[in-house]
Amino acid sequence: MTDKKKDVLQPVDDAARRQAKTLVRTARYASLATIDPADGSPSVSRVSLATAMDGSPVFLISRLSSHFANLEADPRCSLLVGEPGKGDPLAYPRMTLIGTAENLSLSPERAADRAHVKSRFLRRNPKAALYADFPDFAFWKFDTSRASLNGGFGRAYALAASDLAVPAGALQSLADFEEGAVEHMNAD
């Protein structure tokens, strides 16, 4: 008799990478798990979500929230993305991203990144324009270290950060395309 547990993870392939990237890019919200510095207990909240051009999740949160203080004390966190449909919610794809979050308002050298993130976030979440410039709100960028994708029953994958990354060479062409597409749509 063996004590070895059967590995239920599937090998990561292009279909899994595509599904993972799609889950992040199409998510309008996520569950954000942070660590309470007072006692180390987990705390979960919901945040509106968008992505930076490189595919990194970004969110806007208020300094008045407990998760803001938690992230300031310890940037380690996780995001759960995935939209359940009708029926059994466990039958739908979902993914937990594990990493750290960075407050973009703390660094003057991140001003260009902050402007880019704000623009993309507000295109995805236009109602946030009402409070995005309030002094107690800040944009945070999530840096993924690894992810756990559940693509549905029997389809589990352990992903590396590189599985979710947009290749550096593609970023500029994507940025150029996005700018032209937005200008074209605004002109129509």
State the predicted function of each range.
Residues 2-72, 80:
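An N-terminal domain-cap segment
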Residues 2-9, 14, 129-188:
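C-terminal edge-of-domain segments
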Residues 6-7, 66-127, 134, 144:
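Short, structured beta-strand-loop surface elements
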Residues 23, 120-124, 180, 184-188:
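Residues that form generic nucleotide/phosphate-binding pockets
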Residues 37, 64, 84, 147, ...:
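Residue-level signature for short turns and capping positions that connect secondary-structure elements
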Residues 40, 107, 148-150:
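Residue-level signal for secondary-structure boundary sites
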Residues 44-48, 96-98, 139-141:
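Conserved hydrophobic/aromatic beta-strand scaffold that supports enzyme active sites
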